[in-house]
Amino acid sequence: MGVLLPIFFGVLLLFTVTPPSMSQLPPTIMVPAPAPAPISPSDLCNGIFLSYDFILGRKIPPNDTADQPYRFESVLTVLNNGREELKEWRVFVGFQHNEILISATDALIVNGTELPALVGNGTIFGGYPVSDLKTAIQTAGDLKQMTAEIELVGTQFMVAPPAVPLPSNISLVNEGWLCPVPTLQSKRELTTCCIRDASIIVNTTITTKFLPRQPGDLTIMYDVIRAYDQNYLTEVTMENHNPLGRLDHWELSFDWMRDEFIQKMQGAYPTVVDATKCIFGPQSLIYTGLDFADVLTCERRPIIIDLPPTKKDDSTLGNIPSCCRNGTILPRIMDPSKSVSVFTMQVAKMPPDFNRSALFPPQNWRIKGTLNPDYSCGPPVRVTPTFYPDPSGMPTNKSSFASWQIVCNITQAKTEIPKCCVSFSAFFNDSIIPCNTCACGCVSETRRTCSAETPSLLIPPDALLLPFENRTALTLAWNALKHKTLPNPMPCGDNCGVSINWHMASDYRGGWTVRITIFNWGEIDFPNWFLAVQMKKPALLGFEKAYSFNASLLSVDGGVNNTIFMEGLPGLDYLVAEADEKDPKKKNIRIPGKQQSVIQFSKKLTPGINVAERDGFPAKVIFNGEECLLPDLLPMASGGRRNGAITVLSFITFYVAAFMVLL
């Protein structure tokens, strides 16, 4: 018994300290560990992350099953996840549903188009008023300084909910960036991650403050040369860099975005002098002691024009270098001193910008001239300050307080209406191929009495000197002689202010000649005019000289000596406007301004050239920077002889008609 007792207590102790088996435990519920949060596409991007999020859309009036409009609201996001600051960000959004953009927060359309704007073919946005996106390294990860969120509201057509009208593409258009094809993250979101082009060396130092200046056909500098708390003085410099670009009677316009107004100007003037909008606006509440009668303009979008030469030395209005030339800006090849135009403005600011360093240039710049190419201008870009000679005469340079550059380039839209046209003629054909019907457009009132679609009719040489409205009898008689069927109604005129006749005057064994005549049918004179002609290379190889024009070969658009550049000789560089005929018997006929010269070509280097065909006629004609519309036809030769022999009776018939039109 004494031996069994310790064994009993030992077994009891073993059962007491041994835990029960799994089968003896009550059942437990296993809780799985939470899944990791999905990684955002932006977190995987080490460059510039772009996203386009469609928020909502709804049907809007009117009801139209063929072209139903819908409202859309979207958000465009630009996030800098890279190692360098993104200056002056530019993002292309490939709208594709005939969108009309109504509003965009914290951004502007780069080409200066005002809202609402047609953006159905895509558009480029730029940040405003904040245009630079800093890095996480610079800001310790402050997303407010790294991100731009643009809320877009507009109208699109024919994409009904629940379908989503996403753009075809989004991409960063800043130079040196590569963007892959966007990825559809969901039915409503499009994203892409843009990275630096490895072939471009970039200065990634944190101290880089301004972008380098960019080339363009025309550049505008906005230099703040004096800065005060409530106003500043700026110098605006327009410079032409295109050898075939120019401006006549330029008009410059822009938008003040912060209620600024122009107090004074020198070297230029607004087309409307009016301070009414200041008196009845917020400016009068701030500038209570200011006499607004001395303010030049309070227009939100003023139009600025150049001054006449008589104001050049005016101490109040002029006295600015490179001002006061009636708005003429020439190519450098003609006169470098006249390729620049300058004026100054004293700009009054509004709160909260009452600080010397609070400087904001106007936006949406546009510049145009009369019978000149169209320019598309980008937004102001902050660049390195401009240096200019010290006005005190000291041998030093002064720096502007701040400088912005606006780059403008010549554009040629498919729907653009030309402003000048060309007619063809040749020694081997007695008919003139006139400018095309409605070459420079036709107004709706004119279309009621003539045909805008019917090709223009051949005309006799005499008719080339007459305005279109005085050519009718001559044209009818001439086409009757040629046994041509006359259309009804007759074709409309070309409606061009300037026309150029290209006449092949001769073609012989050693060379050939062309006579060029420039006609000014408008009401504006053209001082310092120029004409540029581009032809096929074989013809240009034979160019020798022009007799009454100053002519030379010019290399443009990457070519070598591919353009004949012509201007008037001293005393012959003024193309006057159309004027009344001095002969009282012809008082109903207007006489165009006219300049003419013969151009000599050699066949020494081009023995196989066929000048009677396309080789002897231009591929492009440019007058004062504006490309002129060429005819659809070329003069035709008949058996190598002049075409269309005329009998004595035909001569009598024709000149009777010609005499009648002059009565």
UniProtKB/Swiss-Prot annotation:
Glycans are attached at residues 63, 111, 121, 169, 203, 326, 355, 397, 409, 429, 470, 550, 561. Residues 1-23 form the signal peptide. A lipid is attached at residue 638 (GPI-anchor amidated serine). GO terms for cellular component: plasma membrane; side of membrane. Keywords: Cell membrane, Glycoprotein, GPI-anchor, Lipoprotein, Membrane, Signal. InterPro entries: COB_C, COBRA_pln. It holds the Pfam family COBRA. It comes from the Eukaryota. GO terms for biological process: cell tip growth; cellulose microfibril organization; root epidermal cell differentiation; root hair cell differentiation. Expressed only in flowers. It is a lipid-anchor; GPI-anchor. Disulfide bonds: none annotated. Its main location: membrane. Residues 639-663 form a propeptide. It is found in: Cell membrane. Belongs to the COBRA family. This is COBRA-like protein 9. It comes from Arabidopsis thaliana.
